[in-house]
Amino acid sequence: MENLDALVSQALEAVRHTEDVNALEQIRVHYLGKKGELTQVMKTLGDLPAEERPKVGALINVAKEKVQDALNARKTELEGAALAARLAAERIDVTLPGRGQLSGGLHPVTRTLERIEQCFSRIGYEVAEGPEVEDDYHNFEALNIPGHHPARAMHDTFYFNANMLLRTHTSPVQVRTMESQQPPIRIVCPGRVYRCDSDLTHSPMFHQVEGLLVDEGVSFADLKGTIEEFLRAFFEKQLEVRFRPSFFPFTEPSAEVDIQCVICSGNGCRVCKQTGWLEVMGCGMVHPNVLRMSNIDPEKFQGFAFGMGAERLAMLRYGVNDLRLFFDNDLRFLGQFR
């Protein structure tokens, strides 16, 4: 047992003088590992008389615990010292000025949508929303566009199957509102729509705002006055507005709406292709068939509808010449609108 006491003293001395955690691990292996000094002493128990083995075994276990406790204590001490040294070296000077954070802002398309909603909210319109995954009936059939109608070729549609699709306009929201609500109805329907098209002025996903008013005694004059007032409020200018005859299956009569070019004030430029006019939206009186399919009597009620692309209006308002810039996530571009 004198050898055991000597081994313990030797191990404790080595632990006390160690200044490195890695060296501490080597000491542990040397004394307590599978081939360590104290482990080898334990293996000599078989050479002792049976009556002495329990007593000697207990002494060896006490010795091993003493060495292990010393190793643990020294390791904790060394790790604490290392942490303190690192904290001292990495101390933060709280008197240094902080780094500024870039502030974000609303996306120009979001700004445009909010502005459109505000313009119509002031004159009594409510905001209505609907599903982006739509069925064929609400996207086409209920809007006077049956399966054989050539107007379907105007919509490059993303289909999931024969009946379900990504909506190509927000007009289905108008249909769903007319199905669930009796006149008078005054709504605007902002939202994402999808068409298989992509170039400088088209995107496969874009934002559209459509409006609907249904009541008694509604005329094209009401539609004309509403649109003229909206466009002047949106652009904050006294713009010239003109209506050109057009065709939409769900309105009759129908019209395209042009405004005096906001870039050249009607003098002619590259943006308006030297015409002095810019097309901004479509409109018309709600077709009687559309009213009937929503169980509204066209003999008693009339309505008008209009639709516009939010990106198109944003391009004109902010002077952007490429629609795709709105979706490139380029902070250099978006930072101009904070």
From Swiss-Prot:
Catalytic activity: tRNA(Phe) + L-phenylalanine + ATP = L-phenylalanyl-tRNA(Phe) + AMP + diphosphate + H(+)
One GO cellular component term: cytoplasm
One biological process term in Gene Ontology: phenylalanyl-tRNA aminoacylation
A Pfam family hit: tRNA-synt_2d
SUPFAM superfamilies: Class II aaRS and biotin synthetases, tRNA-binding arm
Cofactor comment text: Binds 2 magnesium ions per tetramer.
PROSITE patterns to which the protein is assigned, alphabetical: AA_TRNA_LIGASE_II (PS50862)
S-S bridge residues: none
Localization: Cytoplasm
Names of the cofactor(s): Mg(2+)
Binding site for Mg(2+): E252
EC number: 6.1.1.20
Gene Ontology molecular-function annotations: ATP binding; magnesium ion binding; phenylalanine-tRNA ligase activity; tRNA binding
Keyword annotations from UniProtKB, A to Z: Aminoacyl-tRNA synthetase, ATP-binding, Cytoplasm, Ligase, Magnesium, Metal-binding, Nucleotide-binding, Protein biosynthesis
Similarity remark: Belongs to the class-II aminoacyl-tRNA synthetase family. Phe-tRNA synthetase alpha subunit type 1 subfamily.
Subunit-structure text: Tetramer of two alpha and two beta subunits.
The protein's name: Phenylalanine--tRNA ligase alpha subunit
Protein source organism: Pseudomonas aeruginosa (strain UCBPP-PA14)
